[in-house]
Amino acid sequence: QAVADQLNAAMASGRCEGMSVLAQRFYDGFESRPNGAGATSEIAQASVAKQIGYWWATQVAPPVAANSKTYRAMTPVQITNEIINGLRARSGFTLGLYSSVGGHSVNPIAVTKDGDNFNIYVYDNNYPGEIRKVVVNSASQTWTYGAAALSSGAASSTWTGTGAGSMDLTSM
């Protein structure tokens, strides 16, 4: 019970990891959307609340945490290359972003190159129906994500990160 209480307390600050993992699993075909919903944003919270909590909690499971640790040792450009390779192979990931403000999880859906910058286009469950982007500067090994928020409805700001440890991936 103590572990469950700790997980519930931690989950109170946001469920983005559970939501992004479940959204990716829907997209990859590992899970079926309930009630015939055509898009993740059309799903009623009550029908997926337990799944969101379950997938959120898996981030502390030893195999998932070890996988995350491997990715956190990579630079932003190395993470970007992993995303590119994953998109080509249709291997889904969630992308974790860590700044001085906190952490957030999004779903990478495309990557483009523009000079020294890579644009990682993402689905952010705080902004249903919108495509956002994380800009990675390959020269400085930094990233920027405009209008990031810790949870839906929370105040947003521009987040930035530098070097290894500021991003990670969760493999599906």
Segment roles from a protein language model:
Residues 100-103, 112-172:
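Cys-His-centered catalytic/binding microenvironment captured across papain-like cysteine peptidases
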Residues 71-122:
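Active-site-adjacent substructure of cysteine-protease-like catalytic cores
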Residues 40, 58, 70, 75, ...:
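Residue-identity detector for threonine
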Residues 24, 28-29, 56, 73, ...:
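Intrinsically disordered, low-complexity regions enriched in small/polar residues
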Residues 5, 9, 81, 85, ...:
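Polar/charged alpha-helical tracts
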Residues 14, 18, 29, 36-41, ...:
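Residue-identity detector for glycine
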Residues 1-77:
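Cysteine-nucleophile protease catalytic domains, especially the papain-like/related folds used
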Residues 30, 108, 134-136:
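General "foldedness" signal
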